């Protein structure tokens, strides 16, 4: 069967290509065919061009770096055949990945409906990678239909809200086209976005593979499909009961809901087609846009891994290192969102979200260039999907402005270290902090025995905090905001919250 000459959907009309880097453009063509491509301006000026030979049914063009531009045309020739994409922009391109809080669409976010109806931003574009966990005919058809959209009235309802607010602020700040490649799935572990090579590179990843297999992950595909269908019948019925309860009883709490209809039947069955399997979605989603030329990666994930925090930083680091390999950029910036405050009504605070935040911070230190957007003053009680997505999106943009563009942008103060003076433990900070009258102190100190007690006296002195507790005569350890849910009171002079920290050595 002859191989059709065509461009990958990522390079269709309206695409955004990355500026100031070699741009990789690919598609399919018969082996041995010579492929020539170029990007031209509206008046015919050639911005970049390249040539390659198709192998194994694919071609990969390497186009020399370009400066930013709009209203361009991408033309690719194969013999007498031509593929032409119009309305091409050259600017900044970010992959937006993670789970449900990155997935939450603009139409469901605060301000979303008004923005969808009225906002026209010719500089912001997005491309939704089809959400497919199995590569089959449906996935092939969905990929063929995928396309770029520009933010304009009536559109962008299905764009990641976090990515939207990130892109809007970035476009306004640097006056450049911004392309967002949306690639996420709610309820996923970091291991879903790691391929086999990344998982097997660490003992922690290998344990996930073994555990999933032991749970039945290698069962026959047809068996998994039957179990999956039965699960969604049950899940949809449960959701319908919950929706009716909320309609009949506005303000009903989750404990009351669970008592009436029973606990949520989540999780779906394991199996070879599950989107929640280790090493799955990276193959059926992320790698469909590899090896695109990117400016950076945006990531908001971790909620699903709070029960397994002890190895999260190792896994996250391995994931990013592998993504940098796949996208052929060892210094690709990784811009992460730290989890906000959250707890379900009636739940005991087990500090698992606090531990996950600290793991995210450890990974951020190891993954330079990169940064972490601090959301310690954000989150909603009993709602794991807060609808304020402007704050995380714009704080993530501030991280990009500092890390990627070398600009001066607001940053949360951070703890740099600690030392002791008698019965006082002193924490050194990257910037001075102020204590607000509202909120909790959330500072604890401990001696060598590791028994933590609330700080009773805090003195803020420039870039130092002096902490004391009558219960700890010889302080050696300190931690801040070691809770799933709380209202913080320590902020920088720029209004951003002090980042959570723990010094236990």
Placement of each model-derived feature along the sequence:
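Cell-envelope and extracellular/periplasmic
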Residues: 1-505
């Amino acid at each position: 069967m002859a191989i059709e000459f065509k461009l990958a959907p990522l390079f269709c009309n309206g695409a955004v290509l990355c500026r100031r880097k070699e741009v990789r453009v690919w598609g399919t063509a018969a082996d041995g065919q010579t492929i020539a491509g170029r990007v031209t301006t509206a008046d015919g000026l050639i911005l970049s061009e390249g040539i390659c030979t198709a192998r194994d049914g694919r071609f990969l063009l390497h186009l020399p770096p370009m400066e930013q531009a709009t209203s361009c045309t991408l033309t690719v020739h194969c013999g007498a055949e031509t593929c032409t994409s119009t309305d091409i922009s050259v600017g900044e391109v970010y992959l937006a990945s993670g789970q449900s809080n990155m997935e939450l669409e603009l139409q469901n976010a605060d301000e979303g409906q008004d923005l969808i109806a009225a906002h026209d931003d010719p500089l912001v574009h997005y491309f939704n990678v089809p959400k497919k966990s199995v590569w089959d005919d449906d996935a092939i058809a969905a990929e063929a239909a995928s396309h770029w959209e520009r933010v304009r009235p009536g559109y962008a309802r299905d764009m990641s809200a976090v990515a939207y607010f990130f892109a809007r602020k970035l476009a306004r700040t640097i006056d450049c086209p911004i392309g967002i490649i949306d690639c996420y799935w709610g309820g996923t572990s970091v291991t879903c976005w790691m391929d086999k090579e990344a998982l097997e590179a660490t003992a922690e990843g290998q344990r996930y593979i073994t555990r999933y297999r032991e749970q039945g992950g290698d069962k026959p595909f047809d068996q998994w499909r039957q179990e999956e269908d039965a699960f969604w019948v049950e899940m949809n019925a449960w959701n319908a009961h919950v929706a009716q309860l909320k309609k009949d009883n506005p303000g009903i709490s989750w404990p009351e809901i669970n008592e009436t209809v029973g606990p949520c039947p989540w999780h779906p069955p394991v199996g070879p087609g599950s989107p929640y399997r280790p090493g799955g979605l990276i193959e059926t989603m992320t790698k469909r846009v590899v090896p695109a030329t990117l400016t950076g990666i945006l990531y908001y994930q971790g909620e699903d891994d709070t029960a397994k925090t002890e190895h999260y930083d190792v896994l996250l680091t391995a994931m990013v290192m592998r993504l940098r390999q796949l996208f052929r950029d060892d210094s690709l910036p990784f811009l992460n969102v730290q989890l906000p405050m959250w707890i379900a009504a009636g739940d005991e605070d087990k500090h698992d979200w606090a531990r996950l935040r600290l793991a995210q911070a450890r990974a951020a230190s190891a993954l330079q260039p990169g940064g972490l957007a601090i959301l310690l003053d954000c989150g909603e009680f009993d709602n794991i999907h807060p609808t304020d997505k402007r704050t995380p999106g714009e704080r993530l943009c501030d991280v990009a402005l500092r890390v990627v563009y070398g600009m001066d942008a607001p940053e949360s103060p951070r703890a740099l270290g600690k030392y002791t003076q008698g019965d006082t433990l002193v924490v050194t900070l990257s910037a001075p902090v102020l204590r607000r009258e509202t909120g909790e102190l959330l500072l604890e100190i401990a001696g060598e025995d590791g028994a933590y007690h609330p700080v009773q006296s805090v003195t803020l002195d420039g870039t130092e905090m002096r902490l004391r507790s009558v219960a700890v005569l010889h302080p050696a350890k300190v931690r801040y905001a070691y809770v799933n849910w709380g209202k913080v009171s320590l902020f920088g002079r720029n209004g951003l919250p002090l980042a959570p920290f723990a010094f236990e050595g």
